[in-house]
């Protein structure tokens, strides 16, 4: 829902944290959850480590809205579903988030939330959708080769998202 955007953005940033450059993270250099590669694509020019370290929530908020919230049509998703899908999109991609929602709603799975997908999702029970999205997400994460390194943090994150999204639903 449109009115949930600011809260959802803040909750995602809480999980994303600050600057990291973990050697086992395939995303590489990251700050506030934004990878260097994605930030360079967004700005359409190269950035330095100093640029990455200097990122602020105000700087990255439009990036998150354009690249994640808008792509999953967060303004139009039911409350709670918006947060669960948005956090999933940030962590594992907008296509995966859309596909999970489409699968749950029983519509054609193409990875893009269009009018038919949106209508079907809106007819579903929001708490059930949140539960299923989070379960599917954990199943996916547990099968990643990096789960041994990052799994504990991902599990805490998904459990927190599930609890907060369920409260919102």
Provide a role label for each language-model segment.
Residues 1-169:
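Cell-wall polysaccharide-cleaving catalytic domain and substrate-binding groove, primarily
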